[in-house]
UniProtKB/Swiss-Prot annotation:
MF (Gene Ontology): 3-isopropylmalate dehydratase activity
Record function comment: Catalyzes the isomerization between 2-isopropylmalate and 3-isopropylmalate, via the formation of 2-isopropylmaleate.
One GO CC term, this protein: 3-isopropylmalate dehydratase complex
Protein name: Putative 3-isopropylmalate dehydratase small subunit
Length: 119
């Protein structure tokens, strides 16, 4: 297995099917671990979290990543996310996927780069 023991928390949430976690704060490492595992950590103030907690279990809450909104039956809330992470999540990209977007440029660079170790 790869990753630190701290990453197990994010893996556990992902294994249970969580796609979004709304909290008052996140530690930097956990926040990034959630993002790296395809989840969306959203920071919201207590007031918003309390309003969401008061909803009925049958009420549907939707998180619109593109519009950066949490949509509940009674109210909408906005949230912030880094534009690069937003792009990665919307396009199901990880670091390898991002690198592969530049595959042709990498190959072209490798072709023109001198091979100093070869005579």
């Amino acid at each position: 297995m790869a990753g630190s023991s701290r990453e197990y928390a994010a893996w556990a949430l992902a294994d249970y099917g969580f796609k979004v976690v709304i909290a008052g704060s996140f530690g930097d490492i956990h926040y990034n671990n959630e993002l790296n595992n395809g989840m969306l950590p959203i920071v919201q103030p207590r007031e918003v979290r309390e309003k969401l907690a008061q909803l009925k279990p049958t009420d549907q809450v939707t998180v619109d990543l593109e519009q950066q909104k949490i949509i509940s039956p009674v109210e909408e809330f906005t949230f912030e996310i880094d534009s690069e992470w937003k792009h990665k999540l919307l396009n199901s990209l990880d670091d390898i996927g991002i690198t592969l977007q530049y595959e042709e440029l990498i190959a072209a660079y490798e072709k023109q780069r001198p091979a100093y170790w070869q005579d």
